[in-house]
Curated annotation (Swiss-Prot):
The keyword Transmembrane does not apply. This is tRNA-dihydrouridine(20/20a) synthase. The active site is at residue 107. The lineage of its organism: Bacteria, Pseudomonadati, Pseudomonadota, Gammaproteobacteria, Pseudomonadales. The record marks 104, 190, 193, 306, 309 as: Interacts with tRNA. Transmembrane segments: none annotated. It comes from Pseudomonas syringae pv. tomato (strain ATCC BAA-871 / DC3000). Keywords: Flavoprotein, FMN, NADP, Oxidoreductase, RNA-binding, tRNA processing, tRNA-binding.
Length: 336
């Protein structure tokens, strides 16, 4: 089932599909990262870093909403828990051209918990439902939710069903489920991505019990072969850290998961395709490392990978002409 996906008939953008997506990741999925990832896959749904309602309503709005037209299909992830604030931000997202707005109900960080953002909201399903309804009433683009299978103290399957059912009653049709509970005290966000065990079986049961909903699986997925297996059960898969650290995995997403017959871009061609973008960023006063830090994984597993990473990170800061370093790094990928 693919609810809420019809593209604007007057748009040349690819239609929004959640069959494969790259997770919102703080400090990682900025607009430079997304531009690079889009070069590798035309079909993957990309997400922004989480933006809080306070930051968007009272901060540098242009910076938080900035994106390139090539990044579509593109979703804005919001963090917040007030219906009015989330509705206002959803309107801003729609006006800025985003294809979807997603509510974060999965982040376990202490910093966001203190502001009633993220996974702690799983303890308040009706509040989440009220927020979703307000957002849906405010915009015409899809409103989705990303959440865990539970939190400590509220981690039974019955409570998960209560959460999903309540939020579904508010109109949400698509749920991206990180197949771990979140432990809200005593673990860092990084530990919360590793220590709680993965429970794909729980998410599969959720899909069985809510067949009318779009259920996207997130957590621990590392290969496109695993994606294909999970897509026999779930409507979509979302990759996080693996897609960032090994970005060339995205180069075969269109062919393996969407049936594209287009040729797969080479690692070398991907890096070369970024050169004009990087040159423009430098010309506008930016630092090349803002962009190339997201590209270090292109050399993963290659002889000289360490030198490749060094050229695009450490050496940049002392280079008079950083584009020469980019060209040196490209030589490591020639023929690949």
């Amino acid at each position: 089932m693919q609810p809420d996906i019809a593209p604007n008939p007057h748009s040349t953008r690819p239609g929004l599909s959640r069959r494969f997506s790259v997770a919102p990741m703080m400090d990682w999925t900025d607009h430079h990262c997304r531009y690079f990832m889009r070069l590798l896959s035309s079909q993957a749904l990309l997400y922004t870093e989480m933006v809080t309602t306070g930051a968007l309503l009272h901060g540098d709005r242009e910076r938080f909403l900035r994106h390139d037209e090539t990044e579509h299909p593109l979703a804005l992830q919001l963090g917040g828990s007030t219906a009015a604030g989330l509705a206002a931000c959803a309107r801003l997202a729609e006006a800025a051209g985003y294809d979807e707005v997603n509510l974060n109900v999965g982040c376990p960080s202490d910093r966001v918990q203190n502001n009633m953002i993220g996974a702690c909201l799983m303890a308040h399903p009706q509040l989440v439902a009220d927020c979703v309804k307000a957002m849906r009433d405010a915009v015409g683009i899809p409103v989705t939710v990303k959440h865990r299978i539970g939190i400590n103290g509220r981690d039974s399957y019955a409570e998960l069903c209560d959460f999903v059912g309540t939020v579904h009653d508010a109109g949400c049709q698509s749920f991206t489920v990180h197949a771990r509970i979140a432990i809200l005290e005593g673990l860092s966000p990084k530990e919360n991505r590793d220590i709680p065990p993965l429970r794909y079986d729980v998410v599969a049961q959720l899909k069985t019990d809510f067949p009318e909903l779009e259920i996207v699986l997130n957590g621990g997925i590392k290969t496109l072969e695993q994606c294909s297996e999970h897509l026999q059960t779930f409507d979509g898969v979302m990759l996080g850290r693996e897609a960032y650290h090994n970005p060339y995995l995205l180069a075969q997403v269109d062919q393996q998961l969407f049936g594209s017959v287009a040729p797969v871009i080479s690692r070398h061609a991907a890096l070369e395709s970024m050169r004009p973008y990087i040159a423009a960023h430098i010309a506008s006063g930016g630092n090349m490392h803002h962009v190339t830090r997201h590209m270090l994984g292109l050399g993963l597993g290659f002889p000289g990978a360490r030198r490749f990473r060094q050229l695009l990170s450490v050496d940049i800061h002392k280079a008079e002409n950083p584009l020469l370093l980019l060209d040196q790094a490209a030589k490591f990928l020639e023929g690949h």
